[in-house]
Amino acid sequence: MYTMTVAPGADASGSFYSLKAAFAAMPEDPTVPVTIRVMPGIYHEKLSLMRPNVTIEGAGASPSDTVISFGDYGYEIMPDGIKRGTFRSYTFFVHAADVTLRNLTIENTAGDSKTHGQAIALYAECDRFIAESCRILGHQDTLFTGPLPPEEYEPGGFRGPTESAPRINGRQYYHNCYICGDIDFIFGSATAYFEGCTIASLGPGYVTAASTPEGQEYGYVFHDCRFAAEGCPQHAAYIGRPWRDYARVVLMDCAIGAHIHPAGFHDWGKEHAHGTVLFAEYHSYPQDADCADGCRPFAQRADFVDTLDGAQAAHFSRELVLAGDDGWLP
């Protein structure tokens, strides 16, 4: 185990003044586990982590004490005259196995998606990835769970760090996290399990835009999560829509706020995908026990949304979803 400490430049207690400097100084042997302890502060950095077996943990009392912050956005024009686009807008890009982020805030500060477009906070394309007690903040496209779909809809649409990489599924586990945004703010093709998380809609839009590949058993599973509104009007958001035709999103024992539309999910105008997507719920319940009738219209779900029974729901346990071929159990 190799341990490093990062602290703001004025704090002499840190071995490194930035995460980027710490990344550059990690042991070359990728099998050596590295823990980076990050002292409280705001780190204005755009980061790429390509080394496996790394744990990065905030040393503050809460994740809001240690913030990794940047503000790139999709509509920004690059020096070559081309828009930055979605996949070059990230604050933190992780492309390595066995990485854990703990007690951190990762944010994209670009702001309003109407004027700035897509702005990724965390771009995670990796296997056996864990985010524990983290805040992941943005607006449109806050969290990308790679890989990318096989093909882009428009030329140059996937321009970014993994546009030419093999499309290899990875498993990701988000526990006790706060994730916010407005449009498609959790999206991608990974197998990702969200447990005990707060998923906050900042305005009208869609929480998920899964692109689960055809034949992949699992996409997104939300267990014991809270779908909350922070400035989003009643019935103005959907749990998800299919970025690709085989999207898979399952909710189990989740609290649903009144901001979620009675239909639950949207088909993105893809009526042909009604028979190929898996959008399903088990024991969804209203966030507030005494809320108005408007937040409990689960009988009004779209006809392509399934209700699971207990036996079906058991198939989506954390143990099964994340096991893979190596029996991983975070």
Q: Where do the model's predicted regions map?
A:
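Sequence-level preference for short, compositionally simple segments enriched
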Residues: 1-330
